[in-house]
Amino acid sequence: AYTGQTGAPWGLA
């Protein structure tokens, strides 16, 4: 539930 490199709400790249 954290923002990743793409800003996705699951914190994926």
UniProtKB/Swiss-Prot annotation:
PTM text:
Not glycosylated.
Q: Does the keyword Ribonucleoprotein apply?
A: no
Its Enzyme Commission number?
3.4.21.-
The entry describes the temperature dependence as follows: Optimum temperature is 37-50 degrees Celsius. 49% of maximum activity is seen at 60 degrees Celsius, no activity is seen at 70 degrees Celsius. Thermolabile, a significant decrease in activity is seen after incubation at temperatures above 42 degrees Celsius for 20 minutes.
Q: Which GO terms describe its biological process?
A: proteolysis
Q: Which domain of life is it from?
A: Eukaryota
**The keyword Aminoacyl-tRNA synthetase appears for this protein:** no
GO CC annotations on file: extracellular region
What does the UniProt entry say about where the protein is found? Secreted
UniProt keyword annotations, A-Z: Hydrolase, Protease, Secreted, Serine protease
Activation and inhibition: Strongly inhibited by pMSF, chymotrypsin and SDS. Inhibited by the trypsin inhibitors Tos-Phe-CH2Cl, Tos-Lys-CH2Cl and SBTI, and by bivalent cations. Slightly inhibited by the elastitinal and metal chelators EDTA and EGTA, by ethanol and by non-ionic detergents.
Q: Where does the protein principally reside?
A: secreted
State how it assembles.
Answer: Monomer.
Q: Which family does it belong to?
A: Belongs to the peptidase S8 family.
Q: What does this protein do?
A: Serine protease. Degrades fibrinogen.
Q: What name has this protein been given in UniProt?
A: Serine proteinase
Originating species: Scedosporium boydii
Task: Print the organism lineage.
Answer: Eukaryota, Fungi, Dikarya, Ascomycota, Pezizomycotina
